[in-house]
Regions:
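Extracytosolic ligand-binding ectodomains
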Residues: 2-4, 13-24, 35-419
């Protein structure tokens, strides 16, 4: 009887002990698996998310988010054991001071950042990169100002052709497009530009004899501070001088809207005077929501990137994830810059900002998502400028902004507006 009672007592105890051992073992295995999960790698995007340039900043951020989702879904950073990318965002706001403060805060709060991108407006980018350079955080930007990569910085990379290069190459190209369509080149030109860094850089060669060298006389040259409250004084001068084409270089959609509406009121729109702009905001989806398509028809603008042949996969992925009707330079830049950081991390083999910076300097990408996101090769010179970065010319046609140059990759042929 005593043996029977002992057996009955020890049976449950033994089973309980076995269960505890099994659970303990499972917990140890689970803890071990968790411990082996690689730490997320943090990258930053600082763009305007409030103020006049918020929409453009949102497009950049959405492009970066599209790339992060794609990279993480495909297994993350393979050289780091499948570590996921984590995108940390900061709001550059509506001034250079706010942009600089955003960079200082983000870097202080996230000391393990390995790289970043932003800040859309060149004036903001100049301020932010003063901070990121000191912190040795590699920074990729689509901003145009020549001064961004002429300061001797080692941690700044400009994927766009600088504004000076764009203006030097773009206007002759556009003049030839006009000549091919009308049979004669324009003889007079007008200039209206705001006083932010990129328009100033873009127009500098034109104001210093570039247009005269092309056989054109500058009959109007006006500078203003954005955003405009009333475009009447500027457009009255366009009406009185009647240039054969107008360089309208603004950094805000609201200024473009006011300018085109006033030109229409004065019977100068719809091709009466061809308008050429600069910057991706001129092709943002909301432009056509605010400006009648007939006023936009034929308007051309110069960018560093737009939807081209060979970018269909990226465009479709972006549109599916964001719900946007088309991909702009901003979305392509956010996507492409993220992939550049991914490629540099794979080559560095560690989540270290200095090592990532060294690898970006060594990149020469001709294929893959990072290369597909940009026209031309992804390779940077010692100053951080992308080598041979070509410009892209876009034109509003039937309510949609389509690439018309370079002609071998463009999605449409250029149409010179006619009066």
């Amino acid at each position: 009887m005593r043996r029977l009672m002992s057996s009955l007592m020890w049976g449950p105890i033994a089973r309980l002990a076995a269960a505890i051992v099994a659970l303990t073992g499972f917990a140890m295995i689970s803890t071990n698996v968790t411990a082996q999960q690689p730490k997320a790698v943090k990258i930053a995007v600082i763009v305007p998310l409030s103020g006049a340039w918020a929409r453009q900043g949102q497009l950049v951020k959405m492009g970066a988010e599209t790339a992060v989702n794609e990279i993480n879904a495909a297994g993350g950073i393979k050289a780091l054991g499948g570590a996921k990318l984590e995108l940390i965002s900061g709001d550059a706001g509506d001034s250079a001071e706010k942009a600089k403060n955003a960079a200082q805060r983000l870097i202080a709060q996230e000391p393990d950042l390995v790289g970043g991108m932003g800040a859309w407006l060149s004036t903001f980018t100049l301020a932010i990169t003063e901070v990121t350079e000191r912190a040795q955080v590699p920074w990729l930007t689509l901003s145009y100002a020549d001064t961004i990569t002429s300061r001797g910085f080692k941690y700044v990379f400009q994927s766009s052709p600088p504004a000076g290069v764009q203006s030097t190459e773009a206007v002759p190209t556009i003049v030839e497009l006009g000549k091919a369509a009308t049979g004669k080149p324009p003889k007079t030109a007008g200039i209206i530009g705001d006083n932010t860094a990129s328009p100033v850089s873009f127009l500098k060669p034109m104001r210093e004899g570039g247009l005269e060298k092309l056989g054109m006389k500058v009959v109007l040259d006006e500078t203003y501070t954005p955003p405009l409250s009333d475009a009447t004084p500027l457009i009255q001068k366009v009406r009185s001088t009647r240039p054969e084409f107008l360089l309208f270089i603004s950094s805000t959609i609201s200024d473009l809207k006011l300018g085109l509406e006033k030109m229409n009121e004065f019977h100068l729109a719809k091709g009466a005077i061809p308008v050429i702009g600069n910057g991706a905001h001129m092709g943002a989806p909301e432009v056509v929501k605010n400006v009648p398509p007939e006023l936009l028809e034929g308007v051309m603008f110069i960018v560093a990137n737009w939807g081209l042949k060979g970018q269909e996969r990226i465009s479709d992925l972006y549109k599916k994830q964001t719900g946007e009707p088309w991909i702009t330079q901003d979305g392509l830049a956010g996507y492409g810059h993220t992939w550049i950081l991914k490629e540099a991390l794979e080559r560095a083999g560690k989540a270290d900002k200095v090592a990532v910076n060294e690898q970006i300097h060594k990149l020469e990408l001709k294929s893959g998502p990072a290369a597909d996101a940009f026209p031309g090769v992804v390779k940077f010179d010692e100053n951080g400028r992308r080598v041979g970065a070509p410009l892209v010319i876009v034109q509003w046609q039937s309510g949609v902004p389509v690439s018309v140059f370079p002609t071998d990759r463009a999605l449409a042929k250029a149409k010179w507006p006619k009066s």
